[in-house]
Design a protein with these regions (language model features):
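Structural signature of tandem alpha-helical TPR/SEL1-like repeats
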Residues: 1, 32-43, 68-82, 103-116, ...
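Structural marker of alpha-solenoid helical repeat scaffolds
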Residues: 6-7, 50-51, 85-87, 119-121, ...
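Amphipathic alpha-helical repeat scaffolds of TPR domains
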Residues: 7-27, 52-67
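TPR alpha-solenoid repeat register
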Residues: 12-13, 57, 93-94, 127, ...
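Canonical tetratricopeptide repeat
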Residues: 15, 19, 60-61, 96, ...
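Generic helix N-cap/helix-start motif at coil->alpha-helix transitions
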Residues: 40, 55-56, 88-93, 123-126
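Alpha-helical solenoid scaffolds in eukaryotic macromolecular assemblies
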Residues: 62-66, 95-100
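Terminal, low-structured helical/coil segments at or just beyond the last alpha-helical repeat
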Residues: 91, 108, 125, 131-166
C-alpha cells in the first residue's frame, strides 16, 4: 500500500486497494479489519482523483464501508448501486451489493444479487457458495443443497469436499 501511495499511479493504487479489499473478507479481528478498510478506502479515493470514471474503483471504494470505514454504509451502497443501475451486468457491482446485503442481514436482497451474479457468471464459485450458505441460514435446505451441489464441481480441496459430502 505504501509503495502504491508513493508511486501514485491509478494502476498501482487500484491493485493495492483491490488486494486489501479481497483480504478483508477473511479478516475476523475488528481492529485490523477497520484499519485495512480505511487503508483500502484511502487508496481507492486517491485513485479516483486520478480517474473518477473507473467503475471498478467506485465499487471498491463503496465496498470498504461494509468493513468498518468511518461513515454510513448506505453511502457505499449508493455508489455501488449507481454503477449496477448503469450496467446491470457488472458482476463486481452485483456481487458487492449481495455481500453488503449479507453483512447487513438483508438475506433476501443478498440472494437476489448473488442469483444475478450466477446468471451473468455461472462459474462464480464464491457467489454459488454464498447462495448455499444464505439458503441454509434461512432454513431452505432444498435450495441450499442445490447450490452446494453446483459448487462441488469447483472444489479441489479434498477436506472441503469431504465436508460438503456430509
Amino acid at each position: 500500500a505504501e509503495k502504491a501511495k508513493l508511486e501514485n499511479s491509478e494502476k498501482s493504487l487500484n491493485f493495492a486497494a483491490h488486494s486489501m479489499l479481497e483480504e478483508l473478507r477473511g479478516v475476523s479481528d475488528p481492529g485490523l479489519r477497520t484499519w485495512m478498510a480505511n487503508e483500502a478506502n484511502n487508496l481507492f479515493t486517491r485513485s479516483l482523483t486520478l480517474n473518477p470514471n473507473n467503475d471498478s474503483t467506485v465499487i471498491g471504494q463503496g465496498s470498504t464501508f461494509f468493513f468498518g470505514v468511518s461513515g454510513a454504509p448506505m453511502e457505499g451502497i449508493l455508489k455501488i448501486r449507481a454503477i449496477a443501475e448503469k450496467d446491470p451486468n457488472n458482476v463486481f457491482a452485483q456481487f458487492m451489493l449481495g455481500f453488503g446485503g449479507m453483512v447487513s442481514g438483508q438475506n433476501d436482497k443478498a440472494i437476489e444479487r448473488f442469483l444475478k451474479v450466477t446468471e451473468i457468471d455461472p462459474q462464480n464459485s464464491e457467489a454459488i457458495f454464498l447462495l448455499a450458505e444464505l439458503y441454509e441460514r434461512g432454513g431452505d435446505k432444498k435450495n441450499a443443497l442445490v447450490w452446494y451441489e453446483k459448487g462441488k464441481k469447483y472444489v479441489e480441496n479434498p477436506e472441503l469436499m469431504k465436508a460438503l459430502e456430509e
